[in-house]
């Protein structure tokens, strides 16, 4: 059995059409059919029921899942070798989930156009980003918390206004609010751990205005917090860019307080002048123009 057998079968399993699979593989249909038959002979079982419509056998479904894993490992092996030989580049990016709505998406789109660049995208909190940068697991990171670490350089890319998230039928959901109006509400904060986190940014915002809030529920993820708001557990604050996630069971309400913002912060290793990191900085600067 050779890797080409796995690649041929994978495409056939995904198209369930010999003609279409042959076109995608840039081979004629008869050779493809022979290759699949050879594979079945080697395995001692049928993988495909050759009827209309074409369908996979139970063994075929299992073999498809396993062959995808093998091909993925082969791809990892090939790319690792090419990166080591300087034929490809690798860029590790860490990001807090809420930064996916602003700045980061356009950067990823630009970088993905480079066929010789392998991207590693890692969802992580700001604290996790710092450790990953120090260990070399990632090269740049996007978060929302300022960290004082001599090994890390941070750059504020923009200030994202905060908005309140309220249940659809909440009496305060009809017009812009002040923090003082929200202070008496039960709050859902996220993430619960590790700290400090975006949650501490929200707590500090109220403390700066001489107020404290009652946290009725902690959540680990932004979307979990919004879901809990929808069912009436409490209210929360999110960056305004999150409003791109439309829901019919909540209301996003603007805040009138001028300081109610959350920064998007780019973090990288201090002194890192690698070409790929400099390229990212250039692309980000171009976005801001």
Curated annotation (Swiss-Prot):
Per the record, the major location class is cytoplasm
DNA-binding region at which residues?
A: 18-37
Q: Which UniProt keywords apply?
A: Activator, Aromatic hydrocarbons catabolism, Cytoplasm, DNA-binding, Transcription, Transcription regulation
Q: Which domain of life is it from?
A: Bacteria
Molecular function (Gene Ontology), one example: DNA binding
**Biological process according to GO:** catabolic process
Please give the InterPro entries that the UniProt record associates with this protein: LysR_subst-bd, Tscrpt_reg_HTH_LysR, WH-like_DNA-bd_sf, WH_DNA-bd_sf
Q: Indicate the segments forming the HTH lysR-type domain, all copies.
A: 1-57
What CDD domains does the record point to?
PBP2_BenM_CatM_CatR
Q: Tell me the compartments it is located in.
A: Cytoplasm
Q: Which GO cellular component does the record give, naming just one?
A: cytoplasm
Gene3D superfamilies assigned to the protein according to its UniProt record, in alphabetical order: Periplasmic binding protein-like II, Winged helix-like DNA-binding domain superfamily/Winged helix DNA-binding domain
Residue ranges spanning the membrane: these are none
Member of which family?
Belongs to the LysR transcriptional regulatory family.
Query: What job does this protein perform?
Result: Positive regulator of the catBC operon that degrades catechol to acetyl-CoA. CatR binds in trans to the catR-catBC promoter-control region in the presence or absence of inducer but only activates the catBC operon in the presence of the inducer, cis-cis-muconate.
Under PANTHER family, the record lists: LYSR FAMILY TRANSCRIPTIONAL REGULATOR, TRANSCRIPTIONAL DUAL REGULATOR HCAR-RELATED
This one is known as HTH-type transcriptional regulator CatR
């Amino acid at each position: 059995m050779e890797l080409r057998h796995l690649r041929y079968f994978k495409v056939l399993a995904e198209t369930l059409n010999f003609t279409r699979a042959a076109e995608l593989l840039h081979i004629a249909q008869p050779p493809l059919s022979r290759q699949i038959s050879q594979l079945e002979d080697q395995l001692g079982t049928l993988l495909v029921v050759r009827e209309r419509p074409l369908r996979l056998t139970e063994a075929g479904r299992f073999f498809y899942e396993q062959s995808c894993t093998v091909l993925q490992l082969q791809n990892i092996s090939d790319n690792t070798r090419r990166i080591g030989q300087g034929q490809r580049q690798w860029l590790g990016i860490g990001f807090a989930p809420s930064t996916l709505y602003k700045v980061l998406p356009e950067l990823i789109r630009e970088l993905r156009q480079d066929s010789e660049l392998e991207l590693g995208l890692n969802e992580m909190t700001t604290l996790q980003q710092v450790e990953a940068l120090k260990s070399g697991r990632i090269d740049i990171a996007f978060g929302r918390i300022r960290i004082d670490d001599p090994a890390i350089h941070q750059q504020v890319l923009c200030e994202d206004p905060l908005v309140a998230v309220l249940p659809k039928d909440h009496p305060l959901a009809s017009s812009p609010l002040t923090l003082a109006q929200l202070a008496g509400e039960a709050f859902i904060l996220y993430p619960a751990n590790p700290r400090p986190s975006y949650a501490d940014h929200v707590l500090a915002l109220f403390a700066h205005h001489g107020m404290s809030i009652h946290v009725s529920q902690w959540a680990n993820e932004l979307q979990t917090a919004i879901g809990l708001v929808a069912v009436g557990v409490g209210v929360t604050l999110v960056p305004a860019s999150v409003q791109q996630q439309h829901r019919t069971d909540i209301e996003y309400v603007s805040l009138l307080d001028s300081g109610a913002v959350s920064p998007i912060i780019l973090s990288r290793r201090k002194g890192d002048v690698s070409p790929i990191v400099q390229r990212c900085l250039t692309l980000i600067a171009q976005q801001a123009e």
